Amino acid sequence: MAFQFNFSIEEDLENKLTSLDDGTCVLESQKGKQDKRQSTERPGLPRDHSWKCSSLGNAASSEDTGSPPPIADRSDDPEACKHQPSWKPAKEHVMPKDVNHVLENTVLEMLPGPQHANTAVVKTVSLKEKFPGENIVSKSFSSHSDLIPGVYEGGLKIWECTFDLLTYFTKAKVKFAGQKVLDLGCGSGLLGITASKGGAREVHFQDYNGLVIDEVTLPNVVANVPLQDDSNGKNEPDGKRQRKSEVGREICKCRLFSGEWAEFCKLVLREKLFVKYDLILTSETIYNPDYYSTLHETFLRLLSRSGRVLLASKAHYFGVGGGVHLFQKFVEEKGVFETRTLEVIDEGLKRFLMEMTFKHPS
């Protein structure tokens, strides 16, 4: 298996990390700067050892079997997610049976800082060579833009609010064990990967762009599962075979999706006995007020009644107009969710961590 680790951080404008006072390294955020090009529309395993992953989406959950909630549950209404037009049909990206090949010809780098020890991510600047020609990679880098209307929504970068939320997970000792988790607008997938490492029973990753899922999210998921040697399992001690089995389970509990939120919503709700998410994680997804209706509807339809959303955002996004206060006002007017500010980060552009829960959970 030939894949390359690169332990230095490229000083490229399109993939530049800056250090905060606490040592956290973040990418310079164009989502917080005015840019005329910004969008105004939405959105290791042993060799020769294959893992057959089956869907976990129909697993039973006691939290979703109670009496009907006072707020109408519209999950069976095919019209409910049609408030805005869809630019990207949703699809599930099937996990490869043999994930050994996922990291072939992929350049990885380690995230800096002790709080991200042993976390490897795709070096996205290397994708320019892997995908020459006209595509979202070339368009993003050539236009120096992270938001291309209806084409690309920033999934190739790790945004600074993602690191804010990762830091909060540690400080607040957020519990993931036994939870069904959605990393919404996942990009690198670091939030979902952290949940998986924390013992989540199932983790779903969603991003607007399929290429981001295939070339960034999936490799990151595979790279952060404990890798074993290349032996085929014959004549191995029982302990080693058990570890391989555990790696397989880690991979199999992850599912990956691409497409616009409303389409993703409809796709997963087609599943029989769909079990809603206990926890939805999302970072820098409220930058455009035009998306608020669809995002709110997604939370309403996919979140367990006793679940919560953990959301990270800048106070305001210049150029597109969204931000925490405008989104909170939108949520309050809807009257479905309660919002609570968990933390305010004043370094650089002001940023917020927020929790959303149902006003009437039962």
Swiss-Prot record:
Sections of the chain in a coiled coil: none
Catalytic EC class: transferase
Record bears the keyword Signal: no
Residues bearing PTM Phosphoserine: S62, S67
Pfam family, one: PrmA
Motif placement: Nuclear localization signal: 237-243
Chief localisation class: cytoplasm
InterPro entries in UniProt: Methyltransf_16, SAM-dependent_MTases_sf
Disulphide bond pairs: none
PTM annotation (Tele-methylhistidine): residues: H144
PTM remark: Monomethylated at His-144 through automethylation. Automethylation at His-144 positively regulates the methyltransferase activity toward RPL3. Probably methylated on other residues.
Compartment(s) of residence: Cytoplasm, Cytosol; Nucleus; Nucleus, Nucleolus
Chain residues that bind S-adenosyl-L-methionine: I158, W159, E160, C161, T162, G185, Q206, D207, Y208, G259, E260, W261, S283
UniProt keyword annotations, A-Z: Cytoplasm, Methylation, Methyltransferase, Nucleus, Phosphoprotein, S-adenosyl-L-methionine, Transferase
Biased composition (Polar residues): 52-65
GO CC aspect terms: cytosol; nucleolus; nucleus; protein-containing complex
Annotated segments matching region Disordered: 18-88
MF-aspect GO terms: heat shock protein binding; protein-L-histidine N-tele-methyltransferase activity
Reaction catalysed by this enzyme: L-histidyl-[protein] + S-adenosyl-L-methionine = N(tele)-methyl-L-histidyl-[protein] + S-adenosyl-L-homocysteine + H(+)
Assembly behavior: Interacts with GRWD1 and members of the heat shock protein 90 and 70 families; these proteins may possibly be methylation substrates for the enzyme.
Functional description taken from the UniProt entry: Protein-L-histidine N-tele-methyltransferase that specifically monomethylates RPL3, thereby regulating translation elongation. Histidine methylation of RPL3 regulates translation elongation by slowing ribosome traversal on tyrosine codons: slower elongation provides enough time for proper folding of synthesized proteins and prevents cellular aggregation of tyrosine-rich proteins.
PANTHER family, per database record: HEPATOCELLULAR CARCINOMA-ASSOCIATED ANTIGEN (PTHR14614), HISTIDINE PROTEIN METHYLTRANSFERASE 1 HOMOLOG (PTHR14614:SF39)
Stated name of the protein: Histidine protein methyltransferase 1 homolog
